[in-house]
A protein has these predicted regions:
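Acidic, low-complexity intrinsically disordered regions
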Residues: 1-211
Length: 211
């Protein structure tokens, strides 16, 4: 069993990429449904606020995302989205029977800008939370950022540079993001080590086409 948590930016700066984001996410979920193994899916959409549209749904029951759920507005309360999701999943694991805790947990965080609107969590708190879950429970975190220094920003969250990547925030870059995320999810679900070149295709795209 794998715990999958997707934290997706829907702030105002994502305007124009709604259809690409929805299509990429749905394609990724469709592919994962064809893979072996069980998974629980949580999806958090964030702007000024965080909205949970899937709360630990069995993968087979995850519905298609539509424009009713994914629409752009507001600012970027990224710390609140990440901190809130870690707290929620962590508490469930803490109080669950040992045999009910998924063997693997993967968080995938995407943002096209810097944190600018969180009220509940700060960098220090979230960094400690992430480092604890990584060290104590082996959770994995991937950070995909556009229009920012993704590695530097990820480091403020306690996420290693080899788990962070800059992507080009356009139609092609968004589609590629979800292809690469899907490949990474497949590796984690199959208990294969997530190599440092998981992000190679995104890096190459940015080199070719610029940020």
């Amino acid at each position: 069993m794998t715990e999958l948590v997707f934290i997706l930016d829907r702030s105002g700066s994502m305007a124009g990429l709604e259809a690409d984001t929805i299509g990429g996410f749905n394609s990724m979920i469709a592919r994962q449904k064809q893979e072996a193994g069980e998974a629980l899916v949580s999806t958090v959409l964030f702007d000024n606020e965080s909205v949970v549209i899937h709360d630990r749904l069995p993968l087979a029951k995850v519905p298609l995302m539509t424009e009713k759920e994914y629409f752009t507005r507001g600012c970027t309360a990224l710390l609140d989205a990440v901190g809130g999701a870690i707290h929620h999943i962590g508490r469930i694991h803490k109080y669950a029977r040992r045999e009910d805790v998924p063997e693997k947990t993967l968080f995938v965080i995407t943002t096209d800008g810097y944190e600018n609107a969180s009220r509940r969590y700060n960098y220090e708190t979230v960094r400690r939370m992430i480092e604890r879950q990584k060290e104590k429970y082996g959770w994995e975190f991937l950070f995909l950022g556009a229009n920012i220094d993704a590695a530097k920003e990820a480091a403020r969250f306690g996420i290693d540079a080899d788990r962070a990547v800059n992507y080009k925030c356009d139609e092609e870059g968004t589609a590629l993001n979800y292809e690469v995320i899907s490949e990474a999810v497949c590796s984690v679900r199959a208990s294969r080590p997530l190599s440092a070149d998981w992000k190679k295709r995104i890096d190459e795209d940015v080199r070719k086409r610029g940020k």
